[in-house]
Swiss-Prot record:
Record's protein name: 4-hydroxy-2-oxoglutarate aldolase, mitochondrial
The protein's enzyme class: lyase
Biological process per Gene Ontology, one example term: glyoxylate catabolic process
GO molecular function: (4S)-4-hydroxy-2-oxoglutarate aldolase activity; (R,S)-4-hydroxy-2-oxoglutarate aldolase activity; 4-hydroxy-tetrahydrodipicolinate synthase activity
Matching SUPFAM superfamilies: Aldolase
CDD domains membership: DHDPS-like
Keyword match Transit peptide: yes
Species this chain originates from: Xenopus laevis (African clawed frog)
Family note: Belongs to the DapA family.
Positions with a binding annotation for substrate: S74, N75, S195, G219
A GO CC term assigned to this protein in UniProt: mitochondrion
Length: 326
């Protein structure tokens, strides 16, 4: 990746983008700094979206100093929801939370046209920003050129700002650095959520784009401190669904330069974060939510609940790090 020649971005972009390139004088008006939980989607026993339990979760989350909410991200099981369900969840969240809470809605689809249509509809449903995951079904053909073309088309047609989303654990595809640098010059692409955890890569992207006001969010609480240390403006953290106050405290410590305290807190969040993401996934996240007073519940098929042994292991991880009593 790092040995690849970067696009001559300004020359390339001038022929791609419908609107003028972002410059030092045209920094984004919208800040996406802060902590965002990528909210889970509760389901009934019949695997229908439980909007009542969603509303209850949101009322509790509004007591935390989150900057906003990511709706229909990976933790929202968006891949298992219908088009109308995806839009209705956005509408319900917008209605339930204060206007100052930013709604970042996942509008990514596999085709460019479908992504544009979903983006427009999500904006109409109340999204302030859209989070667009990399298309990946034909990942072997998802070159930098293909991805720049895709995101440029989406951003040109989006009525709200666009945040790029790289999540290689789910897509098998890292949004290339050269593509990010090129796309950072589009006036309607304001940032990147990077869930890969490669701090060298994140630092390089920030170094190459910060003069444009491009904003990078860490995609996990597991490397939130590291992200802040290289210039990230915040994080989209699954663990914030469970330990919202603690993740926000870590943000505060980092922003205030209290690095020793931040390091100690970060250490206690690493294992729980890994447990509710890569190790046990959304079933683990929802189980932990239940323990901490939120509505997690079951997942939509084909995701299965944790086994009894997995539940014991998950609880042990939270216990040894001081978040649950034994």
């Amino acid at each position: 990746m790092f040995g690849r020649t970067l696009f001559p971005a300004r020359a390339l972009c001038s022929g791609l983008f419908k609107t003028p390139l972002r410059t030092l004088a045209t920094r984004p008006a919208l800040s996406i700094g802060g902590i965002y939980p990528p909210i889970a989607t509760p389901f009934t026993d019949k695997e229908e979206v439980d909007y009542g339990k969603l509303h209850e979760n949101l009322q509790k989350y509004c007591s935390f100093p989150f900057s906003g909410f990511v709706v229909q991200g990976s933790n929202g099981e968006y891949a298992y929801l219908t088009r109308e369900e995806r839009l209705e969840v956005v509408r319900r969240v917008r209605q339930a939370v204060p206007k100052e809470k930013l709604i970042m809605a996942g509008s990514g689809c596999e085709s460019t046209q479908a992504t544009i249509e979903m983006t427009v509809e999500m904006a109409r449903s109340g999204a302030d920003v859209v989070l667009v995951v990399t298309p990946s079904y034909y990942r072997g053909k998802m070159t930098s050129s293909a991805l720049v073309h895709h995101y440029t088309k989406v951003a040109d047609h989006s009525p709200v700002p666009v945040v790029l989303y790289s999540v290689p654990a789910n897509t098998g595809l890292d949004l290339p650095v050269d593509a990010v640098v090129t796309l950072s010059q589009h006036p309607n692409i304001i940032g990147l959520k990077d869930s890969g955890g490669d701090i060298t890569r994140i630092g390089l992207i920030i170094h190459k784009t910060k003069h444009l006001g491009f904003q990078v969010l860490s995609g996990s609480a597991g490397f939130l401190l590291a992200g802040y240390s290289v210039g990230a403006v915040g994080g989209v953290c699954a663990l914030a669904n469970v330990l919202g106050a603690q993740v926000c405290e870590l943000e505060k410590l980092c922003l205030n330069g209290r690095w020793q305290e931040a390091k100690e807190l970060q250490h206690r969040l690493i294992e729980p974060n890994s447990a509710v993401t890569r190790k046990f996934g959304i079933p683990g996240l929802k189980q932990a939510m239940d323990w901490f007073g939120f509505n997690g519940g079951k997942c939509r098929s084909p995701l299965l609940p944790l086994t009894e042994q997995e539940i014991k292991e998950l609880r042990h991880i939270f216990t040894v790090n001081g978040w649950l009593s034994s």
